[in-house]
Amino acid sequence: MILVLLGPPGSGKGTQGALLKSELSFEHISTGDMLRAEVSKKSPLGLKAEEYMKQGLLVPDDLIIAMIKNILTEAPHKNYVFDGFPRNVNQAEAFETMLNTMRLQVDKVFYFDLEDDVIIKRLSGRRVCPKCGATYNIYYQKPKNDTLCDNDATPLIQRDDDKEEVIVNRLRVYKEQTFPLIEYYKYKNKLFVVSADGTQEEVFEKLKSML
């Protein structure tokens, strides 16, 4: 079975992908992790990808598709969940073409739906300890002292990409890119909408009921 998880930043799709791996033994494929792994092992595809990444450019779709094909070829009978890929209709079409050559297909696509104001709260409320890496949220998971880490009393920081104006822009870009993709999978009768409002356990139960 091949699943695709879609959803805006802060919708928790990465967490749900990790739960599918730990609870149901899916192989969880995040394209960011996959790219970093290929670069670190200096594979031929990784070396090509690194040339683009060093220049701050997006890695071309054909390289990403080739990496995914290598993973699937090694174990075509496993269950896979793709997190954050495809990102647009062009990638979805290239992915589908590649899967067809292997007599595989995307079985279901889950879109994690969440209101913008909840996403902004989830992300802009994040605070991180620069010393130990502990993460808090001033709305949902407060430290004992509002501004200090529970572990080592280091002042907490807000990362630049968690600032509200950055999040609003990320959401705008995400919608522009991804809404056509949602329509693409809806047309193919593969789209399932999951309400991402709730605890990660509650959302996972909803997801499992749709598998």
Curated annotation (Swiss-Prot):
Region: LID, residue numbers: 125-162
Coiled coil: none
Classification via InterPro entries: Adenyl_kin_sub, Adenylat/UMP-CMP_kin, Adenylat_kinase_CS, Adenylate_kinase_lid-dom, P-loop_NTPase
Cited PROSITE patterns: ADENYLATE_KINASE (PS00113)
Main subcellular location: cytoplasm
Record text about domains: Consists of three domains, a large central CORE domain and two small peripheral domains, NMPbind and LID, which undergo movements during catalysis. The LID domain closes over the site of phosphoryl transfer upon ATP binding. Assembling and dissambling the active center during each catalytic cycle provides an effective means to prevent ATP hydrolysis. Some bacteria have evolved a zinc-coordinating structure that stabilizes the LID domain.
Protein name: Adenylate kinase
Originating species: Hydrogenobaculum sp. (strain Y04AAS1)
